[in-house]
């Protein structure tokens, strides 16, 4: 039987889908698992995935995998499930229950990087100092707001971290050209597999809720991860030091909220603090980074 597993979302969601792939294969061991997503490179060398396609690049897919075949499609989005909206269980558990699959207590994602990839890509990241790796901003290209208070790391935190570590570390910043830059950092923008090797190669890491911390968990690299609107209960990993934002200092205006409390892109009127500097305790973040490994 052909099982088509469709993942709608970014690279972080694709990484989170890897334990779901394992659950599918556990339930249907003799099936062929075909993954359709925006980031097929996440699933390369994954022993539980037989084929991985990108949206819009699956010529003759119907004829090859559907027409006249025994097949099953898993395409529902867990973000619309009640359990996800209640935010009281991990997304992987919601996803597997939604498809009536085995639910594992370990929700850790998996990435499979080859030795040749490590050797080739690590040469690009030679550093004369240990590397402190940052991912401070997320979301898709073309966002109106370069900084989302609901998702991204506040500038006062980033600048304090840079000042604290710049003498002893090369501070490498994963960012696209359209994202916020910081003086005193080295910008890196590369393909996913290359960035995964960089994450594995780095000495310390500070992330927000985006693909970086999922990849770090998959590669067994403990990191400091900051959370504002989203919660580590749903998206986090126990390997990390998950620092949740301070209690709100003002009542948010939720005029536009529908089935989720906050717009992850950082709706300006929903901001639940008086000042950006109130979101995190900078000293707590710095201590967490120092205590890594």
Where are these regions (language model features)?
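Catalytic machinery of carbohydrate-active enzymes
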Residues: 1-293
């Amino acid at each position: 039987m052909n099982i088509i597993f469709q993942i709608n979302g970014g690279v972080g969601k694709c990484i989170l889908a890897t334990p779901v792939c394992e659950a599918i294969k556990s339930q249907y061991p003799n099936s062929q698992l075909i993954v359709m997503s925006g980031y097929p490179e996440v699933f390369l060398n994954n022993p539980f995935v037989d084929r991985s396609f990108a949206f819009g690049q699956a010529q003759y897919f119907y004829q090859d995998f559907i027409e006249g075949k025994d097949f099953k499609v898993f395409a529902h989005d867990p973000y619309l499930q009640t359990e996800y909206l209640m935010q009281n269980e991990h997304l992987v558990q919601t996803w597997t229950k939604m498809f009536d699959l085995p639910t594992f207590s370990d929700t850790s994602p998996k990435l499979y990087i080859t030795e040749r990839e490590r050797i080739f890509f690590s040469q690009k990241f030679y550093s004369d100092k240990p590397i402190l790796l940052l991912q401070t901003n997320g979301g898709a290209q073309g966002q109106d707001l370069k900084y989302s208070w609901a998702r991204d790391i506040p500038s006062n935190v980033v600048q304090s971290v840079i000042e604290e570590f710049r003498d002893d570390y090369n501070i490498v910043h994963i960012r696209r050209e359209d994202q916020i830059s910081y003086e005193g950092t080295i910008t890196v923008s590369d393909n996913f597999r290359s960035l995964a090797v960089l994450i594995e190669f780095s000495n310390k890491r500070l992330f927000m809720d985006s693909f970086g911390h999922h990849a770090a968990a998959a590669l067994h690299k403990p990191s400091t991860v900051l959370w504002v609107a989203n919660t580590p209960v749903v998206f986090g990993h126990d390997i990390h030091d998950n620092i949740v934002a301070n209690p709100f200092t003002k009542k948010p205006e939720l005029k536009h909220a529908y089935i989720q409390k906050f717009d992850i892109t950082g709706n300006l009127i929903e901001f639940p603090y008086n000042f950006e500097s109130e979101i995190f305790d900078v000293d707590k973040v710095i201590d967490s980074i120092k205590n890594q490994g």
